[in-house]
Amino acid sequence: MGETDEYCRPASLADLKALITSLNRQQVDYLLIGGYALFVHGYHRATTDIDVLVPATVESGTKVKSALMMLPDQAAKDLEPEWFAEGDNIRVADAFLVDVMLNAGGETYDTLKRYATTVDLEGIPVQTLSLEGLLRTKQTMRDKDVSGRHILERALNLVREHSGE
């Protein structure tokens, strides 16, 4: 962890639900990715942050900033919507970490939106990716991407076996 996030606690399910509710309320185009995306699909992988992939636009930055103002420490107040158009991922270190991703494993919101699916999380609609879409975000050689890729490949094989593909 970097020095800016050493004071953050791990994100909880309650944090995820509050964040997704706020993103939905602000009508943010987003896709939940990473460990919590696996969780909403029914697979468990240890994670400490919440990763959301958003379009790399100023408009998206404005909406995301508004949505993130629900975070307890209001760290999002320092975000500049113009940063989003630059395409670099943004880490918001508040009470818990939110990684606002503008690219993931070489993929963007626009290249992945065809894999978008909505999953119900205790009555909250969550915009995320299908398992195939999530696998596309795990094509790097980082240790956690390699392990995530193995989990996703096994899950996809199970789904295919059950559907007769």
Q: How would you label these PLM feature ranges?
A:
Residues 1-165:
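Compositionally biased terminal segments of proteins
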